[in-house]
Each structure stands twice: as C-alpha cells, then as structure tokens.
Amino acid sequence: MEKNLENLTIGVFAKAAGVNVETIRFYQRKGLLPEPDKPYGSIRRYGEADVTRVRFVKSAQRLGFSLDEIAELLRLDDGTHCEEASSLAEHKLQDVREKMTDLARMETVLSELVFACHARQGNVSCPLIASLQGEKEPRGADAV
C-alpha cells in the first residue's frame, strides 16, 4: 500500500504525512514532533513513527483539539492513560456542545435580523445596521 516510510527527507516526510515542510518545522518548534539528529554533514531523516505522529496531530486538530491539548494527548499515548485521555475528550465534547448552543443562538438572532431587513425594504433605517450600532437589540441578542 504505502512505500517504505523510513529514512525520509523532510520533503518526502511532509508529503507522506499530508502536510507541508513548514508545518513539520512548526510542530517541531511547538514540541509536538521531535527533531531528529542531523548526522555530521548530512540531512535529518524521518520515519514511519514520525508520519504517524503528524497524522495524529492533524486528526486531533480536525476534532477541535488545541495544540496544547494535542501535546497532552501525545504525552498520554503510551496506552496506560486511557482515563486521562477520556477526560480530555469529555471536556472537549462539553466545549463543542457549548459552542453549538452559542451558534444556534447566533443563527436565531441573525435570521431575525435578515427577516427584519427584508420586511422593511425601502425604509431609511436598516434593522441589521441599527442593531449592530446598538440602537435596538434583536430578541435573544442578550443571550449571545
């Protein structure tokens, strides 16, 4: 399926991991990816474990984990800290649910403002602009 993922240069490594070279360097600066030794007069080489680690970071980012949270998950990656990893995921799930609630409120307020704009077409005052200027708060805006 995949070619040999050992002894890779940074460019080949980045491509195999699905990122660019600057992402690799950024992860190294952040401590998410160890920087391999550089043999005298040679270039650093990366392996399959490095590719797997970068893919892990990208997957965790897609789930909404911050780089600090990902660093913590990587620290727990020895298989003996499932409870701690689960706790981190539970906190992230709660954050996601709170954001979804906030987004639903925002959607309601924006929908009302758009409707009000369409209903008052031709009037001098736009309800959306007036609301954003603080002249009149739409229903539910205080909850956002």
Swiss-Prot record:
CDD domains named in the record: HTH_MerR1
BP GO annotations: response to mercury ion
InterPro entries, A to Z: DNA-bd_dom_put_sf, MerR, MerR-type_HTH_dom, MerR_fam, Tscrpt_reg_MerR_DNA-bd
Keyword list, A-Z: Activator, DNA-binding, Mercuric resistance, Mercury, Metal-binding, Plasmid, Repressor, Transcription, Transcription regulation
Any one GO molecular function term: mercury ion binding
DNA-binding span(s): 10-29
Pfam families tied to this protein: MerR (PF00376), MerR-DNA-bind (PF09278)
Positions annotated to bind Hg(2+): C82, C117, C126
Residues covered by the HTH merR-type domain: 7-76
Entry coiled-coil feature ranges: none
Role played: Mediates the mercuric-dependent induction of mercury resistance operon. In the absence of mercury MerR represses transcription by binding tightly to the mer operator region; when mercury is present the dimeric complex binds a single ion and becomes a potent transcriptional activator, while remaining bound to the mer site.
Record's protein name: Mercuric resistance operon regulatory protein
Organism: Serratia marcescens
Upper lineage: Bacteria, Pseudomonadati, Pseudomonadota, Gammaproteobacteria, Enterobacterales
